[in-house]
Amino acid sequence: MISFDMGSGNSNVQEKVPETFQGYVECPVFSEDCSISLEKNHIVLAGRFRHLEVMYGEIITIHLTAYQLTLMTDSGQITISRMGQKLQWLYQKLYAAFNETVLEVFKVTGKALLELTGEYTAKEEGMLHGGPARIRLYEDCLCILPPNENARRLPLCFLKDAVVRNYTYELQMHSGERISFSKLGRELDILDRQMTERLHKLGKKTLEWQKEVAPDISSMQAAYVAGLMPYGRGAQFQKITEMAPSFAAAIDKQIKESRMANTYPWLLELCGGQDFWTGILPAPKQDSLLENMECLQDGNLELSKLSGLLNANKDESTSEVMPEKKAETVLWMLVPDKAKRIAAVELSLTENEAAATYIYRIPGAWEDFAIQIDRALEAGEFDRQLIQLSEEQLRLPENLEKRMLVKRTPALELLRKQFAGRAIHTSMDRWKKDIETCCNNTCITSSEKEKVMEKHCVTCGAKLQAGVKFCGQCGTRAI
């Protein structure tokens, strides 16, 4: 239960936030006095004759002024007022519940190591957003939680640079984003120190995993690979081979013994053996179904979710393309064709996971797009439904959490836009035919590529000329 100081003369006097609030609600459905309560996944607005439940995932923004609380939702605006001091309490409680839902969508686990409040600015592909936000540091990520749909999860394995400058904390991601935090006060140094500690632990975890994959890897080679592909990321196989041959050989051996064994030679032929990316992680624990069965006995698991676990991806049947072998690792390959027009993404997940190759159009430079693919795979935990669901399907109520994740992960939005098709692993001949059909039907012209690669000034919105460092209209530095 959250408690707030009432501001009376006695600082020890506190009043508990009520479970149910009373206020005047105005919305497209009704306008009247309501009882207001917050459940795990939604807010309940109960009038005398009308009843409205709004899922937190439907909320676009939460805005508090001195006299009213405004919720912008997918279906319209909701205004709550006539609550006095309790309006602030409702806002705090709603904001906290909203954030917990977002963190669940991000699949964040474990306890927050640090939580603070400040302001942030994020620059993503020429777009700018920011404002006040809660900031939480976890074992493997930093989460930005504003009171709107612009939340971001920043995996530490994709962090390229972190520096304290002019009382701000500036981050640069390998996937291109630049994020700065300000108005942190004394907690700025604490955040910097905690981030450094987490990065050190990530480096140690990476080295331990490398030794497990390739016991004969040297210390120098391990240090190079750790910088190239921290735990959770993939990297260009050619670079791995040049600097750590033993580690590259270990990955190659794992692929040849995995469910990708039969498709591996053809994928190498597709790219000419050049420029493809690989990644490797330990396989997840196989007790998730058992845990969910226990939850079902306790009444804590929806039947629809259990059905999904038992029947997931039935249409992607596995036969001669993928040998049935026990999965000890998770492997993935990102393979461009020689002309860099399309990319094939091949996964080797758990032994019960159905198999298919996903094809994407390459919108710009291959290396930049490969990083975006890698970022999307990490964010979605290799969930291919996030890519193949149509916009209409994504808007269905049962896909609300997926829609929230896509909206808050630019890399997933990009992959969905560039998705060109898939080749199901039913037979080698069928698989090859599907791949070739996707390749033949997928061709981005030079003008289309230029349009995709267009960048605009984050200040005035003017189109930036290729290669320039400053906007020709307002002089803002290009990012």
Language model features with spans:
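Eukaryotic intrinsically disordered, low-complexity regulatory linkers and tails enriched in Ser/Thr/Pro
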Residues: 1-479
